[in-house]
Amino acid sequence: MAVLTHNEASQKVDELRKKLDKWADDYYAKDAPVVEDAVYDKTYQELVELEEQFPDLVTADSITQRVGGEIKSDLSKVEHPVPMLSMGDVFSKDELKEFDERITKLVGHSVAYNVELKIDGLSLSLEYTDGKLTRASTRGNGRVGEDVTANAKFIKDIPQTLPEPLTTEVRGECYMEKEAFATLNAERDEKGEQVFANPRNAAAGSLRQLDARITKKRNLSTFIYTWVNPPRNITSQHQAIDEMNRLGFHTNQSGRRFESMDEVFKFIDEYTAKRNDLSYGIDGIVLKVDDLSLQNELGNTVKVPRWEIAYKFPPEEQETVVRNIEWTVGRTGVVTPTAVMDPVKLAGTIVSRASLHNPDYLREKGVRIGDTVKLHKAGDIIPEISSVVLSKRPKDSKPYEIPNVCPSCGETLVHLQDEVALRCINPMCPAQIEEGIIHFASRGAMNIMGLGPRIVKQLIDKGFINDVADLYQLTPDQLGQLDHFKEKSITNLLSSIENSKQNSAELLLYGLGIDHVGAKAARLILEKYKNLEKVSQLTVPELTSIDTIGETIAESLTAYFNQPSAQKLLQELRDSGLNMEYLGTVEEEAPDNFFKEKTVVLTGKLSAFTRSEFTKKLQDLGAKVTGSVSKKTDYLIYGADAGSKKDKAEKLQVPMLTEQEAIAKIEK
């Protein structure tokens, strides 16, 4: 790492934290990772090294001082009396040796390890009172998780009653077997619903359901591997596993006790080779000091136990041949290249396609038709070309020529300013129309259940719809002509379409799929201007008067509504009975109070509530909670170990409240 000044390090730390917070939120709260594990781990390690080099930059809210992600769901919250910590990660055998040497130095002698498979699932705590299951919860941020007790009662291998009247807590992993995952995705695909990216996401989404009946259908499983307060006669990790197994918990029997690192490495090699043959997913191997008294002696850091470490498998690579490069058109006109390859088994699934993202990426990789390429799965999820094997390139190979016409409508493709993507700007492009209707019906927009990609394609192919307004003119007779569409499906879809007419107008605005206008921007615009027809007449200055709405969003929105076709579509939707009004939020209905219409920033370690809970309380009072201090900030609320935000507030003379002072004003 290059030598940085203190100011440069401070800026870099802020940049890394923002990235990691976003990625952690996608992973933990949304069950939708957007970067591969290796990218996340490298970025996280860079932050750790900077904080070690500049200790004064460490803050209580840094991701290096937290476990997991903030809790963002409607499930009840559960506080963990004993925090559910995450594990430290290593990525090589040399790092494992260093871990062993560190343990040996700390305890003064060599130790035995219980070596276990690292299950790719969601952490789960099970609490029993007098032998009966009383609570199940997720890890959440390590201190506060989510109550999933009702759902746990429908997981077949979780004992509801123990053979002995124990009051205890055990922990493990909730996962979905590969076969159950394949069945679930096949069912969702058949219904036109979005499929899950991987078994871990499927398990997390299934366990965290508000409706336990859905969990029951998802066929989840568990492996239990930790006993929080084991009986005194249990003195080792391997003994704890055996005893938990005797009590009826589902434990993984592949783990072994080793006294040398050579044995550990052989175990790693064994499961690296056969991981894809297992019925469940694993993403590494876990080493745990076997002696429980030594575990207690070694203790924990603020985030991870010192007595255990996770070895992460390197990405598996395979070679295959590129046979074609296909281009597909998205709803905003972006045209994306995809490599079509000879099918190859990779990380347990057959892969024959990999995205090449954009023309610059394609040129950078230098991929040509006929090339042999090395392929891996980013984060064990997304197929990605690592490199071209130049030694195997055919002698008659020619550089690939980027197309200049749209593969759907034949119009000339363009590069817009400051964009790497190619675009089709023909508003009547069939592919864009299809993708636009799919987006309109999606859960984040109009939420028309049962209107997935397959159904949309059939409706377009049969000439029943040409734009989103046509959805509201569909008849039972038309839907009856679709493949595998029976009476119940017809009734449900028409009912969902009818119900969508009552949605708040920001969902309709987002559903229109205007470039750069995401769900948050749509909500902010409608919060201020209330009516979608009024929004369609706004100018760029009127739109940019809204905090966080910049010129890019404003210009895109005004350009869209300046098109006669857009005004015609809006009129057709209004005539079909769609609501054009913003229906409001809790914040608008808040009575007069100290924080109403104030801009507030939280910083430091809060004790009475989690940060997300405190934020929600303030928002319910009509406050706007932001992440950074500026001249527009009305109040900074700070807890223990407040850092740079408090310093900045002092410089800007922003009024400050302690956590307790703020709570007192909330409770007035």
UniProtKB/Swiss-Prot annotation:
It catalyses: NAD(+) + (deoxyribonucleotide)n-3'-hydroxyl + 5'-phospho-(deoxyribonucleotide)m = (deoxyribonucleotide)n+m + AMP + beta-nicotinamide D-nucleotide. NAD(+) binds at residues 37-41, 86-87, 116, 139, 173, 288, 312. Disulfide bonds: none annotated. PROSITE patterns: BRCT, DNA_LIGASE_N1, DNA_LIGASE_N2. Residues 590-668 form the BRCT domain. Its EC number is 6.5.1.2. The keyword DNA repair applies. One of its GO terms (biological process) is DNA repair. The active site is at 118 (n6-amp-lysine intermediate). GO terms for cellular component: cytosol. GO terms for molecular function: DNA ligase (NAD+) activity; metal ion binding. InterPro entries: BRCT_dom (IPR001357), BRCT_dom_sf (IPR036420), DisA/LigA_HHH (IPR041663), DNA_ligase (IPR001679), DNA_ligase_AS (IPR018239), DNA_ligase_CS (IPR033136), DNAligase_adenylation (IPR013839), DNAligase_N (IPR013840). It comes from the Bacteria. NCBIfam families: dnlj, PRK07956.1. Belongs to the NAD-dependent DNA ligase family. LigA subfamily. This is DNA ligase. It comes from Lactobacillus johnsonii (strain CNCM I-12250 / La1 / NCC 533). The gene is ligA.
